[in-house]
């Protein structure tokens, strides 16, 4: 399993457009082969900073999503006009357990 951590600080006045694009992409994302889940969080420390945490079956699924044209268009718009700053981290999950499954 792969985790993608996307941290973003939109430019002032751009957050609504960012969330609009994210909502549009979500419909495609939820049907995308290899996608598992996504959640979005707002920082309690850094005003205006958001984090999206998504989980994927494997690296190939992430690469196919990255290459999808409507996702590429959203990335371009983000970099060109919406984002003050962003950072993407991708990592492999080496352990996954919870109270129901145990260790």
Residue spans of the language-model regions?
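Arginine/glycine-rich "motif VI" loop of SF2 helicases in the C-terminal RecA-like domain
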Residues: 78-80
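Conserved short loop/helix modules at catalytic or binding sites
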Residues: 74
